[in-house]
Curated annotation (Swiss-Prot):
Pfam families: PGA2. Involved processing and trafficking glycosylated proteins. Residues 76-87, 119-132 have a biased composition (Acidic residues). It is found in: Endoplasmic reticulum membrane; Nucleus membrane. GO terms for cellular component: endoplasmic reticulum; endoplasmic reticulum membrane; nuclear membrane. It is a single-pass membrane protein. It comes from Schizosaccharomyces pombe (strain 972 / ATCC 24843). Its main location: endoplasmic reticulum. This is PGA2-homolog C27.01c. GO terms for biological process: intracellular protein transport; protein transport; vesicle-mediated transport. InterPro entries: Trafficking_Pga2.
Length: 132
């Protein structure tokens, strides 16, 4: 139940062989010109992207979230006015940023309390066992 290649090739007429040779030869002749044209278009697009601010063909990650770029020293987790942006194509890491923001708030809230304040109530428990 195999494919008979020899029989298949013998069934080609002279017209079919000439047609194949014309297609393959035409492709071989036109291909270098198509490659040069593609290189020119690619170079033009690369130059255009460099002028727009993209570096080495990579997109700014903030562009994928649809937000403005952060200034030096700002963290993505501190962005409290972040709203759902329907125009944003990607929402990678949104839950993680929200979780870290919540942890950071808890940490700073607990920093206001002194560890000595937690042990102040322990003296009351011990006083009943102490003798004057």
């Amino acid at each position: 139940m195999g494919f008979d290649v020899a029989g298949y090739l013998q069934s080609y007429s002279l017209k079919d062989w000439i047609r194949i040779i014309v297609y393959v030869g035409g492709y071989m002749l036109i291909r270098p010109y198509l490659m040069k044209l593609g290189a020119k278009i690619q170079e033009r697009e690369h130059r255009k992207s460099l002028l727009e601010g993209e570096v080495d063909g990579t997109l700014d990650p903030e562009m994928t979230h649809g937000t403005k770029p952060k200034e030096h020293g700002e963290f993505d987790t501190d962005d409290e006015e972040e709203e759902e942006n329907p125009d944003a194509e990607f929402r990678w890491g949104y839950s993680a940023r929200r979780r870290i923001r919540k942890q950071r708030e808890e940490y700073f809230k607990n920093q206001d309390k002194s560890p000595l304040d937690a042990y102040a109530d322990d003296d009351e428990d011990i006083e009943e066992h102490l003798e004057d």
